[in-house]
UniProtKB/Swiss-Prot annotation:
Keywords: ATP synthesis, Cell membrane, CF(1), Hydrogen ion transport, Ion transport, Membrane, Transport. One of its GO terms (biological process) is proton motive force-driven plasma membrane ATP synthesis. PANTHER family: ATP SYNTHASE GAMMA CHAIN, ATP SYNTHASE SUBUNIT GAMMA, MITOCHONDRIAL. One of its GO terms (cellular component) is plasma membrane. It comes from the Bacteria. This is ATP synthase gamma chain. InterPro entries: ATP_synth_F1_ATPase_gsu, ATP_synth_F1_gsu. One of its GO terms (molecular function) is proton-transporting ATP synthase activity, rotational mechanism. The lineage of its organism: Bacteria, Bacillati, Actinomycetota, Actinomycetes, Bifidobacteriales. Pfam families: ATP-synt. F-type ATPases have 2 components, CF(1) - the catalytic core - and CF(0) - the membrane proton channel. CF(1) has five subunits: alpha(3), beta(3), gamma(1), delta(1), epsilon(1). CF(0) has three main subunits: a, b and c. Belongs to the ATPase gamma chain family. The keyword DNA-binding does not apply. It comes from Bifidobacterium longum (strain NCC 2705). Produces ATP from ADP in the presence of a proton gradient across the membrane. The gamma chain is believed to be important in regulating ATPase activity and the flow of protons through the CF(0) complex.
Length: 307
């Protein structure tokens, strides 16, 4: 009887958990479409800013910090985008694992990484392990706004533009989760600064071949009032747009990961309920069989006594 009461108690508690998991899954399902659309809609603007920066840097020969790394400064900024809440499967643990790997590689290369963390789960993880954190931000990791992107970008830009002797950094990395689809989300490491120029491969012309009628010619730019001032103006927009895009795709990934995790948890809870119900029914059947056996045995004993 005691085992049956314990099984009933476990079934009730598991049913309550299943309801919670299912509710979390439904909430995530209602948010994922919007999160995905917001992330996709932000990408064209970010790509346009990045193309503009690439064009500025590729077609000029300058020593602006946006394009040139200070080789004498070993300090490097690393921004990890984690989550505020749990119940998202391996989302935060994957980010932390990749961040730890990046920090190890930077240490091995003789760098001095400075850690910046967005998300309560990540900051709690590193604070518990007494890891020095340059700055942390929390709140709305599943629905980040422009304000938090601006706050983070201002902090990182100040660190990047600050001279080395005053604690500035020479590189800026960001670790985030890219939303591919509802099933696949991949952890990425992006070196945001200095800007890496992607050079197109050019084919060596064959003198025997006729030259094409049209050819890709690098456009000529005129910068007003000056190239340096244009770069100074576009740098904050570049950093903020890249960080905002990473925040949005990370939010979509977090929501998708939470939906998948809650769907799996709901299925596991229901399977556990079925298993516990079978055990309860078997226990009841055993109790009934034992009671019937005792009744039949007692009846046989009374019959023999009367004879």
């Amino acid at each position: 009887m005691g085992s049956q009461l314990a099984l009933k108690s476990r079934i009730r508690s598991t049913e309550s958990l299943a309801k919670i998991f299912n509710a979390q899954e439904m909430i995530a399902s209602s948010h994922i479409a919007k999160a995905r659309d917001v992330a996709l809609n932000a990408k064209p603007y970010t790509d346009a800013i990045f193309d503009a920066v690439q064009a500025l840097v590729a077609h000029t020969h300058i020593t602006h910090p946006i394009a040139v790394k200070d080789e004498k400064n070993p300090r490097v900024a690393v921004l990890a985008l984690t989550s505020d809440r749990g119940m998202a499967g391996p989302y935060t643990s994957s980010i932390i694992r990749e961040t730890e790997s990046l920090l190890s590689r930077l240490d091995a290369a003789g760098k001095q990484p400075e850690l910046f963390v967005y998300g309560r789960r990540g900051s709690t993880y590193y604070k518990y392990r007494n890891r020095d954190i340059a700055a942390t931000w929390e709140g709305d990791t599943d629905q980040p706004g422009v304000e938090i992107a601006e706050t983070i970008s201002n902090t990182l830009m100040d660190a990047y533009m600050k001279p080395a002797e005053k604690g500035g950094v020479s590189e800026l990395y960001i670790v985030y989760t890219e939303f591919i689809n509802m099933v696949v989300q991949k952890v990425r490491v992006l070196r945001m600064l200095p800007v890496e120029i992607v050079k197109n491969e050019t084919k060596v012309p064959d003198p025997d071949e006729e030259a094409p009628a049209t050819a890709d010619v690098a456009p000529l730019y005129t910068f007003e009032p000056s190239l340096e001032k244009v770069l100074d103006a576009i740098l904050p927009k570049y950093i903020q747009s890249r960080i905002h895009e990473c925040l949005l795709t990370a939010a979509a990934s977090e929501t998708a990961s939470r939906q998948n995790a809650m769907h799996t948890a709901t299925d596991n809870a229901r399977n556990l309920i079925d298993d516990l119900t079978r055990k309860l029914n078997a226990s009841r059947q055993a109790s009934i069989t034992q009671e019937l056996t005792e009744i039949i045995g007692s009846a046989d004993a009374l019959t023999k006594k009367e004879e």
